[in-house]
Amino acid sequence: MSTKIQKTDAEWKALLAEKGAEPVAFEVTRHAATERPFTGKYEDNYAQGTYRCICCDAELFDSSSKFDAGCGWPSFSQELNKGAIEEHVDRAHGMTRTETVCANCGAHLGHVFPDGPTPTGLRYCMNSASLDFKPK
């Protein structure tokens, strides 16, 4: 997408509070923090539905691509719509990883790794705090 949704930190905080987002959601989505493993509300959620960006409601993942990676964060094998997620090189913490962000608003979602199941071989390792689940 060519133009991302832009807001001030105060506007993002207000929007997330309005949505009833977890307190850590602002730090995760706007400052690339990571929630602690095995603490996110969607790690063990296997209901059918769609996972959206907590900040802008963009559809990111379908529950059919969710799997248990045993890593402590919700994991998906593919994005719902090509282009919904942007990838950037992340060299923080002495590692080189691929960061994932919402293409619509730039919210930090998590990271993608090349160790997932077939057919994609990818593991989108997401923070629950960056997601909002809409059941089918």
UniProtKB/Swiss-Prot annotation:
Known EC number: 1.8.4.12
- Report the protein name in the record: Peptide methionine sulfoxide reductase MsrB
Name the family. Answer: Belongs to the MsrB Met sulfoxide reductase family.
Q: What is one GO cellular-component annotation here?
A: cytoplasm
- Write out the catalytic residues in the record: C125 (nucleophile)
GO terms for MF: peptide-methionine (R)-S-oxide reductase activity; zinc ion binding
Can you tell me which residues bind Zn(2+)? Answer: C53, C56, C102, C105
Free-text remark on how the cofactor is bound:
Binds 1 zinc ion per subunit. The zinc ion is important for the structural integrity of the protein.
Family annotation (InterPro entries): Met_Sox_Rdtase_MsrB (IPR028427), Met_Sox_Rdtase_MsrB_dom (IPR002579), Mss4-like_sf (IPR011057)
State the species of origin.
Polaromonas sp. (strain JS666 / ATCC BAA-500)
Q: Which reaction does it catalyse?
A: L-methionyl-[protein] + [thioredoxin]-disulfide + H2O = L-methionyl-(R)-S-oxide-[protein] + [thioredoxin]-dithiol
- List residues of the MsrB domain: 9-136
Q: Name one GO biological process term.
A: response to oxidative stress
**Gene that this polypeptide is encoded by:** msrB
Please provide an example of a Pfam family that matches this protein in its UniProt record.
SelR
Q: Write down the required cofactor(s).
A: Zn(2+)
Keywords (alphabetical) are:
Metal-binding, Oxidoreductase, Zinc
